Amino acid sequence: MEQRLIGREAELKLLNEYINSNRSEFIAVYGRRRVGKTFLIRKAVEDHFAFFMTGMNGVAKGEQLVNFSISLQKYTHSTTLQTFKSWLLAFYALSQYIETLPEGKKVIFIDELPWMDTAKSGFIPALENFWNSWAVLRNDIKLIVCGSATSWMINNLIRNRGGLHNRLTHHLIVKPFTLHECEEYFKAYHFGYSRKQIAECYMVMGGIPYYLSMMDKSKSLAQNIDQLFFADNAELKDEFNDLYRALFKKSADHIAVVTALATKGMGMTRQELVKASGGKDNGAFSTVLEELEQCGFIRLYEPFSTANKMTSDIRQKRNTLFQLVDFYTLFYFRFIKHNKYQDSSFWSSSQNSQLYHTWAGLSFEMLCLNHIDKIKHALGISGVQTLVCSWRSSNTEKRTQIDLLIDRKDETINICEMKFYKSEFEISKEYEEKLLEKLRIFTEETKTSKSLLLTLITSFGLKQNKHSDIVQKQITMDELFI
C-alpha cells in the first residue's frame, strides 16, 4: 500500500515555496527521530533529486566518503567508482556533476547529515566551501540537509558562527503529530479506533508516525501495543537504546538524566538532577540538558509563584524545573525496562488493573500539557499571554499539589484538574471538599490576588449533580482533537 502524507500542510507549503524560489536555497530540516522528516521531503520533491544520499551511523570518515562515492555514481552512471580522500574533493566532484545537468531547479538532499561529521573529518569546512564558493553563486541549487540529531543541526547549522554563519536560508522543524493528525492517520488507513483509544495510543508512543506505521488495523489497540513492546519478538523492544544512541554521541549521559527524571513526575531542579543522575554540575551537564530539550525529551518550566515574570529567562533561575515529557520514554521506564511479568499479552491483560489506571491518569495529564494550545483555544484565551506551570504546597504534611495551572496576564489563573475516565466524570461530595481545600491552601500559601477558575479537563465530560457547580469551566477530550 502506498504511504500517504498525513497532515504537514504548513511544512509542505513552506518546502514548496523554498524549492520554487528564484534563488539558491540552503534548507535545514530537523526533528526527533522517526518523526517523518525524510518522507516529507521526498513527497515535496516527488523523488526528483539531482543528488540524494544518507549518512551512515557510527562509521569513520573513510566509509562515509565511500558511501558518498557510491551515491554519486548512481547519478553520474559512471562505470568506475570515483573515490575521494577528503570532503573538499567529494563536494567538488558533486559540483562538477551538477554543472553537467540541464537548466532547471536542482535539488540536492543529504539525509542524516550529523552522522557524516565525524572527528577531524573536515566535513563542516568542506560543506561551507561547497555552499559559499559555488552553490550560493547560482540561482538553481536547492540544498536540503536533514538530521535527527536536533542539537547538532541547531548548533552546527542554525547557530553556526563560522563559515556558515547566516548562510542557512531556511530551517524547518518537523514535530510529532498532534492528536488531530493522529486521528487523520488512523482514518486514512481505515483503523476503527475511537478518540479515547487514539488518545491512549498517543499516551503510549506520542505522535510519532513511524510507530503508528507499525500498527495493524486488524488488531485492537491493546493487541498492537503488546505486539510492538511486549511480545517475544517485539519490534520496538530495543527502541529505547537505539533512539538515544542514534541521537547523542555520548548517550549514557543523556540516559542518566532521563532515568533520574522518570522517577519524579513534576520534574527536578538542576541541583536535584545533578545528584540523582550522578553527574557533575558543569558546562558538559548544561549541554546534555540543552540537547535533551532541543530534541523534545524534556521541558523547562518554573513552578508557580506570584513573583513569576513572563518575560524573564527561565534558565537563569534556581527554581527552574526540568521535566521528562517524551511519551515513549515515560512508557519505557514505567512498563518496559523492568517488565517483571514477562507476559507477551501484558497490556491486554492490564486494561482494568490499578496499574493501568494510575498510568492513564498521569499520562493524560502529560497529553493535556502537550496540547496546551488546544486548551487555551477552548478557554478562549489563545491571544492572552500565559505561563503554564505546576505548584506544590510548601507544607509537606498537606502534600497538596496542582499539576497544571495557567497563569494569565489578565489577572486570572486556571486551576486545571485532568481526569481520564471511560465515561462522564462525577464529582462526589468528598472530591468537592478536596477541591475546595486545594483552592484554599493555594490561595493561602501563594497570597495571589488573581481570580481562580477551576477548570476540569476530562475524556467524556462532567456529569451534572449537586457538586458539579464547583467547576467554572470544563473541557472535553474532543477539544484536544481540533
Residue map of PLM features:
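Phosphate-binding site recognition
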Residues: 1-350, 454
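A cross-kingdom feature that marks ATP-driven nucleic-acid transaction machinery
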Residues: 314, 318-482
